[in-house]
Amino acid sequence: MSKTHLQHLYYVFGTDVSRFGNFIGEEVEESEDDSQHGIDADAYVYDDYPEEAPEATGQELMEIDGESLPDNGYAELTSCVDEGPSNAVILHEDKQYYPTAQQVYGVDVETMVQEEDAQPLTEPIIAPVEQKKFTIQEADLPPVFFDRSFMTDLMNFPEQIRNIAFAGHLHHGKTALMDMLVLETHDITDRLEKKTGKKRDEQLRYTDVHMLERERGLSIKSAPMSLVLQSTRGKSHLINILDTPGHVNFVDEVASSLRLVDGVVLVVDVVEGVQVNTEQIIKHAVLEGLPLTLVVNKMDRLILELKLPPTDAYFKLKHVVEEVNTVIEATLPGIGEKRRLSPEKGNVLFACSSMGWCFTLQSFAKLYSESYPGSKGNKGIDSQDLARRLWGDIFYNPRKRSFTRKPVEENAKRSFVNFVLEPIYKLYSHTISASTDELKNVLAKLGIVLKPSQYKTDAKVLLKLVCEKFFGPSNGFVDMVVEHIPSPVEAAELKLGRYYTGPMDTGVARAMHECNQDGPLVIQISKLFNTSDAAGFRSFGRVMSGTARPGTQVRVLGEGYSIDDEEDMSMATISDVWIAETRYNIPTDGVPAGNWVLLGGVDNSIVKSATLVPPVLPDKEEAYIFKPITHFTESVFKVAVEPINPSELPKMLDGLRKINKSYPLITTKVEESGEHVILGTGELYMDCVLHDLRRLYAEMEIKVSDPVTRFCETVVETSAIKCYAQTPNKKNKITMVAEPLDQGIAEDIESGKVSIKSSNRVIGKFFESNYGWDLLASRSIWAFGPDDLGPNILQDDTLPSEVSTLSSLARTPESTKRLIGPFMLTYR
């Protein structure tokens, strides 16, 4: 009650009243009549109006805190005063001290009275502006040592493009190798030191942008980078690189990445050699038909940690190379020799990514040819001839200045030890142990000049500076990639033959085969990257033909799409087109065929992978998809989840849908009991999934059950009773029997030793020679299930003499397909 209201009551009562409306003075005795009739004293508010009190005008009565209300605001009140004393009983609910909302705002205004606060106390009335950021992003485009317009021009020449992936075991140096290339092309060293305090001897880890990747020190997601690099000839190439995780739990990221590349750069730690995950990746890449190149990384560990003599270091290097070749030969017996890796072929790179150097035999031989260019009478050193003599059992005779296959003396050194390893050993030892004056003299002979302040830096920083000056840029890496990994045009035939489900004689197939940027738009999507605030996703894929431009309308064909079943299809419009650079994205007007592209606006209907095509293809051709990604592991680690607050179940379901998009091999489903189950590859994988579910996508607390292993049913003995099905017209009948496979068949199918795509003759010969099947049984295999690498076999065990009608019918492609479909669905 305001001050003005109280003042008005003073006039009405004619008695002193306190600020709370209580009487001040002697207590008035209650009359007997009033007590008997139970009349409240408040009913006489307007009675006994004192004559000596000055009459208040209507305007004064309507003044509230100095502001006037409409004249009708106190109509009832003033009328009561004008009438004088009254004996009328005014009930409490009929009293009116304030005007109604209708009287204040008018008849035409609808007013609503909220008697209870519907907003919970935990929710602020004015919520603060939240800026969520779960990944590291560059605020602006960082400066680079090449012109970005030149990079976009290179995208129009598929012959100058190479699409590769860095793959290997955990902590073998893939991300460090990427850092070396990033620092070579990006002018960010000084900026990082000023803004983050990161020293020159600390690993940059440029492609580790997820918060978990930074905390745990390992890569979880694949990270793309597009860089312009030069070869030893000075020719620029656009190298698109995917840095893949090395942990065995995250090989699903590797499989998704290999679908978009034309070759694999295998990174192996020279000390640890080929590990289990390395072996898995080699087998998968070989079975997918991808060319392999090898990077023997962390060469400095031989010098600084193991302290091996140069001769022993050579044998260690040779052993690592032969380990890789052994796995290739075991995967493809008889064909491995053609795909052999060897330094003299130029497909093996020696590197120390932490020190920022790498070389092939050809690039190291070029250092000698540049140091000894020759004169008029002296031809000088031919780098190609020298490179061919720098590996294997080839020895140098210093007396005759020639190379021999046999050692001249007992302790003769191989040419690789003499010309490659010993200079590196000496460079390391002088840089670490020599005094400043001695080091200056040694470096002066090599043509290396450093600032005086650089000699006073830490030994590790100084060693990195010296190595970068000595070896120069990574031209040897570019030479290896350009020479031994095909361009998108050269690899198109292999890609289409393995992954495209449509015919090869159509206009769309020809456009993809030629990487025609003017052809119909076809994009293969294999990965989804969440935005920095985790509110949405962007689709990452490869443009197979045409040019991806913003505003283009496309059909999004899911993994289950086919000509017969078009349910898994939706329409979308490409809102944005970027060149993906992990920490930043370069917006562009179009990305032509042969390149990788990051798209916005098409992710709503994509779960794992998809194919994007125009709404209508030229000549009204049918649209076909690329096959779903083949993974070389399974999700067998299972947990059940539920929200702590049951009302947050919709938020959890939305988070599970986003988790399903983010992780390629994650599986989410609802059991018959109603519990929500998540299936992953391992404990670390599941830990990352649950972290993202809690913090990134659902932002809620969940309860998680104890982890269990997924179990699958199998057949242990032949069916005792034949199972049959009959058509409605009773004229056709099919009978089936289940029996276990011989030991080892499932492993051979899953490893790719036998393929259902091979001819009946090849398949029959395999089962006949390896498992003793008869010729008829081995050539009667219809399908492997539930996919081409599935451990189940559908076999036609009918004899023409017994059921000639069914046998002839079953051998038609249409009827066979109708039988194979339910078989695949059953075992899925």
Each language-model region and where it sits:
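Long, acidic (E/D-rich), serine/proline-rich intrinsically disordered low-complexity regions
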Residues: S2-T4, Y10-Y11
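Structural and coupling elements of P-loop NTPases
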Residues: L9-E26, E30-R828
